[in-house]
Amino acid sequence: PPRRTRLMQVEEGGDFAFEGEITNYMSATSSVSTDDYAVLNRLSITVKVRFTNALDEKMSFNRTFTAFEDYESTRLLSEVEGELIPQIVDKLVTDIFQASASNW
């Protein structure tokens, strides 16, 4: 669902700026069975974000955010990436927005 905010995206001259890059993209076992077989795998994405608040420099930050989704180990990563990446990105966007807007 779309986010409801009065903020508007502008190409330049904005009060807030976000920059960032993906620093980690990893799939690893997240749960094993009693006989040591992987039951669930976890796709994790980590991003480093530089947030600049032109109105209050004290609110600016450089932070790392990580979000993940688990998937059944019987499925290949290539089968689930298209489904999981949008879910993970949505979590990252929410976390980053909340961190930048926490004192509004």
Where are these regions (language model features)?
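Surface-exposed short loop/turn segments
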Residues: R4-T5, G13-S60, F68-E79, D90
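Compositionally biased, intrinsically disordered linkers/stalks adjacent to structured regions
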Residues: E81-W104
